[in-house]
Amino acid sequence: MSLVQGHGTSGLFTEPPNPINQQESSGPSLPAQDAAQAFASSPRAGATSTIVNPPKRKYKGAVVVQRATLSISAVLDNGQCVEIKYHSNLASALTNLCNTNLYDLPACLNRPITAHNLPALIEEAAAPYSLICYYQRGTVRRVEFQAEVPLLSFPLKFLVKQGKVFLIKDISQMQKCEFCGSFFKVTHTCALRRRDFYFHHVAAHSADWWEKISFTPIGAPPNTERLFIVYDVETYTWHGKFGKQLVPFMLVFQLLGDDHLVNVAKTLATEQNWEIWNGKEQDTLYYCITPEKRAIGVKFKKFRDTLQQHIAASLWSHVICQNPQLQEKATTLGLESPEELTPDQLKKFKLKGNPRFIEVYAVGHNITGFDEILLAAQVVSTRAEIPPVFEICRNFMPRAGRLLFNDITYSLPNPSYVPAKSYEHWEQGQVLASDLKSQYIKFMVRDTFSLTHTSLKNAAKAYSLTVSKGCCPYQAVNEFYMLGSYQQDADGFPDLKYWKDQEEYSFNKDLWIKEKKGAYDIIQQTLDYCALDVQVTAQLVNKLIESYQIFIKNSVNLPETSFNVFQRPTISSNSHAIFKQILYKAEKPNTHHLSTILMAPSNEMYEYVRLSIRGGRCYPTYIGVLQEPVFVYDICGMYASALTHPFPAGSPLNPYERALAIKAYEQKMLNHKTISYFDKDLLPGIFTIDADPPAEEFLDVLPPFCSRKGGRLCWTNEPLRGEIATSIDVITLHNRGWKVTLIPDTRTTVFPEWKCLAREYVQLNISAKEEADKSKNQTMRSIAKLLSNALYGSFATKLDNKKTVFSDQIESNIAKEIASGAYVVKSSSYIETDNLCAEIMPEFVVAYPPVNSDVRQLAPPSCSEEDPTKDPLAEAPFMHNFSMTSYHYKPIMFIDAEDDDFCLHTLEKSTPLIANNRYPSQIASFVLAWTRAFVSEWSQFLYENDAGTPLENRVLKSVYGDTDSLFTTMEGYKLMEEKGKKRLKKNGGKLVFDPSNPELTWLVECETQCEKCGSDAYSSESVYLAPKLYALKDTTCPKCHHVGKGKLRAKGHATSTLSYDVLKACYYADMQQGSDVFKTSRMSLRRTLTSVQAHVQPFTVTETTLTRKLRPWKDKTLHALDMHRLIPYSRKHPNPRNTETTWMELQWMT
């Protein structure tokens, strides 16, 4: 028994037994206050009492009294870190403060205090010093007040936080950890995870530097319906105000795909009076011929628009049949039909049924650089009669004179959509119907050239097609449409000058004679030629779909994937998708992105990483005619071999761990003359560096690094200042004798580990290529070679802040961004004006007299109607004989259309920073760094023995260096056979990096080989004029003494008119200051998509003649050692273009 105090004055009484307080430990217990109340009213001892069970509490848990004083840590507006302690109860705190200082609470402070009226109340209270601290997201903005006539003797300090006002008790100084953001007074210990989180998600300067890369499996829903419209056009030259413009006069197309979609398209083609080629409907080849300008585009647009409408109606009918309740929903909303629902309204309803996924492709060869541009002004419009219930998304992207994207998607909600929780099927490349939020109809433009990178003629051979491309006398067709006739031979066949050569002329004439079709019909022959091109392209489409599906199934080992190579527009985008799929399968991140395995630099970091991407070398070190043997060596699959090496992986280190990693590099460079690229103590990184070269006599003509400081990319032996370089380049420079200093830079990036991210991708492509060689499968060999070479380019993709939109695509969010200045309109282009209904007002001239102060009265406008005989000039206004001003009005076209129908805008972000969540650009930087390591090792084979000898006294060993090749003299050839034999492919060796035995892995082979015996051969004489402008006279075999043909390269010139002798004569004419001028001319097609130039019409292809002068290198980026030899710039021979000032801190002055 225990004694308890009663609430009255009666003293103590015994507490009766309370079974409630003796429950099991798992049951709730009464708090002390409730127990006291329960027994305060109970009878005293001896009295009969009844125990009443108290009501159960609604909430369980500990009851915590609110603290009287709270605190926050923040950074003041002057950068000082502080801790602010404040009272949680403003009213009582103010009262206590005033009472402590022997004041009553001022009436003004007794009113409700808010963040808005606080400044006025402070001025009314008139404290000698007052302070308001406005707190927001870790920072404090201070506003101070000082009363001229104080009414109080103590200061007032307030804190405004989340719209509430508090009284500050104390402000004390603090310190802030720069690595994890924690505040502390004396000492502090932070955790690794907190440091990483702060750096990547909290710190204002670095939180947006790295983005996770989204992932989508490479497959497509297995029940996807597809239709391919394979087409080709033929053009003639039309001379207009914009020059020689190419105008289509013929279009042929063939239909492939699912039968029901093909039948719909065939019915539409018949209804719209498309002619059937050769009268064979089963071939599904249709054509139209008309020389009328833009008529072909209008007819093809009508066909594509009508097809869109039919397929959209089919999909909507499918949805309505499965969801009849939509009619009732529409009626409830006051709509006549469910079609009038908006996409947002439809998303609110729960749909039922099976989704449909429909894809329609317009396919051709080289159409994104030619055909689609000619037709774009007619076919790019989205103004088809599509029900408004569809959500429309357009991806229109012109780039480098080509239509990279021209896709339209009409989507509806997918009733089967379920957010993915398990990603095992993603690892196998599968996309299920439940993975997609929308069912859709996609209309896409695809170019087989972008997937094969070769001409249609070569593609037919490379992919083993049963038909081949024909020949057409284009110029004869041009003259026929321009002049009405063309030159013919005695048999009425187009003259020899219209054909490529005598062989082509004879071959096609023989075919024509054998066909015995009578007189040569140039239009019919052109139609047959165009139809044959379409047939070849159609076979190529089927071959690509089938072959890539087999490649993904067997070589990539994804047997369940439904892969469609046309789902992505280019071979580069397909290679990148396959790479990500292989990486996703290997790493199993179990999410919708690649996690932290591989991240993309963004905003400020994107620019920093891009600065570390340095292109390949390409320059001659000898100018003129060289009359001694030259061998050409080429690195075998340079980018593919580089891609098998380790690359940076993981989320970049925070500044603390980064500093430790940098220290490891500095210690290694200080203590070791040579560092291994595969030292486990060194992590991958991108640094800002200074580098000083060794003494002049220890340099060579193959520098390990290049610089853009002079305005042009230049391989130089000069000191490097403030360059952005990878850790591989740091090691390369150090091993070549350069003194490298890592400069402190907040953007310096170090990654936590090395990984062979692309090794499996390259390995499977090499294996597929070798297997194809064994089985003589030319198609698989072509696919494997293309995919192997294309991956590097996808990593190096350069993004910009521009996008092209149509007026009808500018939605409210884009309009707000333009209004706020986030986007600016760089240019606007107008198209289709020739096809819209228009009323033209002819040219007219109006003469106006100058203002005359004597004219006071105007004649009534109807005076001539009242009296036709009265002279209207008898009264004012009338024309005097003094000088007048004439205004000439040009014809005015009034177009019956809205600007949204034909206005195209190019928008650009106002910020120079580029957001990137797609491409890991650091991989491209490291790929090039590995190739520089290859060439650095190569240079050691040739020049290691020359160390200490001045450059002018050395034997000539190499004369030209390209990205992946080197031209050596006989002396250089001997050194390769002796010191570089390990790297010669003919001696065996690996092309794929082996992680278990890490070493640089690359091979070279002699490109100049004897065409008879296959031995290494040389060119007995060669001439070098400039980068990418050289010629080898022949290929001489030292074994069998066979002399084969040479090699010529002249980038930008018409090589058909050049030869070794022409280049040689050009060099001698320039050296002897002769009067001969050497030029080359070739036809060039100028492609214009969007333009702000008045003399250029958007969406046109114009034909121009490009003439270039042939001459030796004038603006050299090397120093001339003598009349022929060139050497890189150095301290002794600095680059004259370098005008940039570099500020350095001299140690002896600090």
Curated annotation (Swiss-Prot):
Family annotation (Pfam families): DNA_pol_B_2 (PF03175)
Compartmental location: Host nucleus
Keywords: DNA replication, DNA-binding, DNA-directed DNA polymerase, Host nucleus, Nucleotidyltransferase, Transferase, Viral DNA replication
Keyword Nucleotidyltransferase attached: yes
EC number: 2.7.7.7
Annotated segments matching region Disordered: 1-53
GO biological process: DNA-templated DNA replication; viral DNA genome replication
Reactions that this protein is recorded to catalyse: DNA(n) + a 2'-deoxyribonucleoside 5'-triphosphate = DNA(n+1) + diphosphate
Molecular function per GO: 3'-5' exonuclease activity; DNA binding; DNA-directed DNA polymerase activity; nucleotide binding
SMART domains in the cross-refs: POLBc
PROSITE patterns reported in the protein's UniProt record: DNA_POLYMERASE_B
Domain of life: Viruses
GO annotations of cellular component type: host cell nucleus
Main location per the UniProt record: host cell
SUPFAM superfamilies: DNA/RNA polymerases, Ribonuclease H-like
Catalytic EC class: transferase
Family label: Belongs to the DNA polymerase type-B family.
Biological role stated in the UniProt entry: Eukaryotic-type DNA polymerase involved in viral genomic replication. DNA synthesis is protein primed, and acts in a strand displacement replication. Assembles in complex with viral pTP, DBP, host NFIA and host POU2F1/OCT1 on viral origin of replication. The polymerase covalently transfers dCMP onto pTP, thereby initiating complementary strand synthesis.
More about this protein: This DNA polymerase requires a protein as a primer.
Subunit structure: Heterodimer with the terminal protein; this heterodimer binds to bp 9 to 18 of the genome. Forms a complex with viral pTP, DBP and hosts NFIA and POU2F1/OCT1 for initiation of replication.
Protein name from the UniProt record: DNA polymerase
